[in-house]
Amino acid sequence: MFETHKVEIEWAGRPLKLETGKIARQADGAVLATYGETVVLATVVSAKAPKPGQDFFPLTVNYQEKTYAAGKIPGGYFKREGRPSENETLVSRLIDRPIRPLFPDGYKNDTQVIITVMQHDLENNPDVVAMVAASAALTLSGVPFMGPVGGARVGYINGEYVLNPHLDEMDESTLDLVVAGTQEAVLMVESEAKELPEDVMLGAVVFGQKGFQPVIDAVIRLAEVAAKEPREFNPEDHSALENAMLSIAEDELRNAYKITEKAARYAAVDAVKAKVKEHFLPEGVENPAHTAEEIAAVFKHLQAKIVRWNILDTKSRIDGRDLVTVRPIVAEVGILPRTHGSALFTRGETQAIVVATLGTGEDEQYVDSLTGMYKENFMLHYNFPPYSVGETGRMGSPGRREIGHGKLAWRAIHPMLPTAEQFPYTLRVVSEITESNGSSSMATVCGTSLALMDAGVPLAKPVAGIAMGLIKEDDRFAVLSDILGDEDHLGDMDFKVAGTDAGITSLQMDIKIEGITEEIMGVALNQAKGGRLHILGEMAKAISESRGQLGEFAPRIEVMNIPVDKIREVIGSGGKVIREIVEKTGAKINIDDDGTVKIASASAKEIEAARKWIHSIVAEPEVGQVYEGTVVKTADFGAFVNFFGARDGLVHISQLASERVAKTTDVVKEGDKVWVKLMGFDERGKVRLSMKVVDQATGKEVVAEKSEKKDGGEAAE
């Protein structure tokens, strides 16, 4: 019934198995990948023909994690998986980026890649396995895909590169880098690092590319026995149209791209485009030689050629800069004084307002992942409204791009944050992109660093980011610092580097062509370092280190530790005690399982009141100390006094006053405030208190000699 094919290799000390022919047989391509005991299913379906009028390639990559893969049931009311999590969105983008450039120009058939995590062994991260499975499924599917692609994770532990480290090993690693590519070229890099130098980062990329070569070989072996017949795809030849268009539009396009201001340049380009359209698609002509879609596509290609030629020939760019110059920068902090921290970062025509907010433990984000529930105390949200590029558009929940850009900035800042012990606050940063002409994610990195320092967060060092581009024709190439939006789209490589003056904290790289050598990548990384250091210098004009104190409107947090066996007493039955403390003091209180208590409030008085209350519950009273208490019950033999928080003790009738007492209620009544001294504990552990040795007016202990004399007299009686 099944015609199965299987390939198995040893990869980084664990077996990798690729299998096809048994599951999802109606898909164009389907591969079940097993690495260790992590199992991932990847499927590919591509429409037989493009939709009429389609002028782009509709590729969709959906990565999904099923909770049954880790033996769990989804939380929430409905108990089934819902919208994609942030991690699922990020992994979908991670897989999309290296495979998209490998589809030929002109292929516009609707294509969907679905990757499902079926089983997770809690040791091997499924994202790289998913990338390998998707590449294999595409290679087998028959669609025009110029793969296969391999992928690997690289760690850096004790000065050594580690291929595909286990999840628990990543805690020791100063690098988390994922690299993907073909046999000949690197296509994609995504990473977070702890201030590593450029040569170490480049070495990790090269190490990873070598590390995934056995995987590519395995996919090729599987394709040799299981691949479907390649689909016939003949891209249209538009060279004649392009040459004709070049002859009438080249000079005007070159002049348009000499205009440095974005809006004016776009207007000039649109005018040339309208002229071209009128020439090749005149009104009233039936059955024209070219469609509007063809003319638009060829004109776009021509734009790219003109810009690339100009840069390579003149070493001058669209806005008049040379290759290494960064656009003018203005950095400001404290622009929203009632927020906890704020910054305005402007670089040329790219601008971000970034706001930092400090919260408490109860503001942490709970993340339910396959590896278990954990809490995240640093959140960075990136918003890209349509007005930032002078357009109208959709508003609503963030898209994949916004989530991806936010995470890139998060990775850049995260290694420089203080530990929870050093700074017990939850941090949320929001970046509002108010203008965009390239590199808004790196503006977010710079703005976030400024806003956090403005908020008083003790960053280890300021962090800056820069977006770089590369244009290559034959043996000529040009590396561009601080690219514009147009240069981003027209280049052969774009990469974003963020870090401190000491090293890189985040690197994201996307390469669209082959032939980008290790030497070229090294030149690009070193040029990026110069740009990053320049930007850090400009940022330092606004603020160079964290403020010594929090903002006026930020909450204060005091941390205290209590014995674990006292947590129940502080919380109380059904949370009764802690609710009372919160209601009466006004402070927010968070208690961790290890006994760490965080008390937060904008008022120091409220924090101190809550701290004293909690201390009175958990601290043990000391023999010989004087405490204030309240009479809660009277009896013939004495009075019960509540003191030191929730503690009760007995003042025997003989200890109520220095003179003889006939009746307890002659001295005290329920509700009376009294001063008591802790005398000790009886043989059953009950508390023994005394009032007569304390001056009830002042709360001070009575002179010892006087007390002893009275004690002796009373005993004689």
From Swiss-Prot:
Ranges of residues in domain S1 motif: 624-692
Coiled-coil stretches: none
SUPFAM superfamilies: Eukaryotic type KH-domain (KH-domain type I), Nucleic acid-binding proteins, Ribonuclease PH domain 2-like, Ribosomal protein S5 domain 2-like
GO molecular function annotation: 3'-5'-RNA exonuclease activity; magnesium ion binding; polyribonucleotide nucleotidyltransferase activity; RNA binding
GO BP term, example: RNA processing
Taxonomic superkingdom: Bacteria
Keyword flag Cytoplasm: yes
Binding site for Mg(2+): D488, D494
Gene3D superfamilies per UniProt: GHMP Kinase, N-terminal domain, K Homology domain, type 1, Nucleic acid-binding proteins
Keywords on record: Cytoplasm, Magnesium, Metal-binding, Nucleotidyltransferase, RNA-binding, Transferase
Cofactors: Mg(2+)
GO CC annotation, single: cytosol
Residue ranges annotated for the KH domain, each copy included: 555-614
Chief location category: cytoplasm
EC number: 2.7.7.8
Location in or out of the cell: Cytoplasm
PROSITE patterns: KH_TYPE_1, S1
Role noted for this protein: Involved in mRNA degradation. Catalyzes the phosphorolysis of single-stranded polyribonucleotides processively in the 3'- to 5'-direction.
HAMAP family given in the database record: PNPase (MF_01595)
Annotated family: Belongs to the polyribonucleotide nucleotidyltransferase family.
Record-given protein name: Polyribonucleotide nucleotidyltransferase
Taxonomic source organism: Rhizobium meliloti (strain 1021) (Ensifer meliloti)
Designated gene of the protein: pnp
